[in-house]
Design a protein with these regions (language model features):
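Bacterial N-terminal signal peptides
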Residues: 9-20
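N-terminal secretory signal peptides that target proteins for export/translocation
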Residues: 1-7
């Protein structure tokens, strides 16, 4: 009897403490929609910005369509878009600081101890979607993953959101979701659709979650002591494994309907991207000498998505080590800091040779300090 009362007492105190924690935390609300888009991997076509000349014959494999059996540089895809409220009538402007996100969904930001409530509306035409976060704490009704897990009813409502429907996901940000002892004061996680993870992510439904230590977010929304933030996803989007493959073939390469297993056709649909752009088409990576710059690096994909981001001209700090190249595996997240001291326009790319040739390259710009 006494042991039972002690157990009940402990349970009640745990509930009280947990409830108090939730009441004291900040709840951050986001409204995201999954939408069909026509995406351009190379808006500069027919010019390669790397050298200012026409794309070479080898480069054209990935960017030149012929209305017959090559789709080209434009593909129908899906994308997460942020709205201002639950009416989903007004898109929230992204702002110049996030211009570089490209195909990625909006930044979802929180501090340790916060609660995130993210309402997802499916505005695609015929594709079930979801939201699944890496690193955060969630119950079964907010996992956003479609598989047989022994649940039913409301606990399955999050698994697959049908076109025209919506669902609100609730995620907690406990201490174990935030930066570790050797991390920077903010780190990055991924969120993505997980109904059919391979087809969903190749379609484009991916975005970043930025988590800061408790009390580290300044009024401007950035982590304290950080002037610029850049989020970059290195990923080989396999358009052969996208929900939109047949739509893209019908729209841009109708003769390829009978060639979907052709090796050359399949190779042409492997888009080696940084935030959904190839061959130096990624824009917005601009900073000034002396600024404190935080880079959030992500990777997702298959066994070919072994990436080694390399910054020319400047170095970075990773967990106390000085580096200019990182290692990324599919599904991993790395956060590093840079304080550039070398002005100029510098190459920033994956150092895997095959990926370089296929266009996984960009530039970042370091402006000189203004003289006083």
């Amino acid at each position: 009897m006494i042991a039972g009362l002690r157990c009940l007492s402990r349970c009640l105190w745990t509930l009280i403490l947990f409830t108090g924690h939730l009441q004291a935390s900040t709840t951050r609300t986001y409204y995201l929609a999954a939408e069909d888009v026509l995406w351009d991997y190379a808006p500069s076509y027919p010019v390669n910005p790397m050298h200012g000349k026409a794309f070479s014959e080898d480069e054209q494999i990935f960017v030149e369509g012929n209305k017959k059996d090559r789709i080209g540089h434009q593909y129908y895809k899906a994308r997460y878009v942020e709205y201002t409220d639950a009416s989903f009538t007004r898109i929230k402007p992204r702002g110049l600081e996030w211009e570089h996100l490209g195909l990625l969904g909006p930044v979802i930001r929180a501090e340790v101890g916060d609660t995130l409530k993210v309402t997802l509306k499916n505005k695609t035409r015929d594709m079930p979607v979801s939201l699944h976060p890496h690193g955060l704490f969630y119950l079964k009704n907010s996992e956003g993953t479609h598989y047989e897990d022994g649940t039913s009813g409301k606990d399955k409502a999050d698994d697959a959101i049908a076109p025209g429907e919506s669902h609100t996901y609730t995620w907690q940000v406990p201490e174990r979701s935030g930066p570790g002892p050797r991390d920077t004061d903010s780190i990055v996680w991924l969120y993505h659709s997980h109904v059919d993870e391979v087809r969903d992510t190749n379609a484009g439904l991916i975005g970043p979650i930025l988590i800061s230590r408790k009390g580290q977010l300044a009024r401007n929304g950035k982590p304290r002591g950080v002037d610029k933030e850049f989020v970059v996803l290195f990923s080989v989007f396999d358009e052969n494994e996208s929900h939109y493959l047949e739509k893209n073939i019908n729209a841009f390469a109708p003769e390829a309907l009978s060639q979907q297993q052709d090796d050359e056709f399949r190779e042409s649909n492997l888009m080696h991207t940084m935030n959904g752009y190839v061959y130096h088409n990624l824009k917005g990576l601009t900073m000034t000498v002396g600024e404190r710059v935080r880079w959030y690096q992500l990777a997702l994909g298959t066994e070919v998505d072994l990436h080694t981001p390399h910054w020319h001209g400047n170095t970075l700090e990773e967990s106390g080590r000085r580096v200019d190249v990182l290692n990324l595996l599919p599904g991993t997240h790395v956060t590093v800091d840079m304080q550039p001291d070398n002005p100029g326009q510098w190459m920033y790319h994956c150092h895997v040779n095959d990926h370089i040739r296929a266009g996984m390259m960009a530039n970042y710009t370091v402006l000189p300090q203004k003289s006083r």
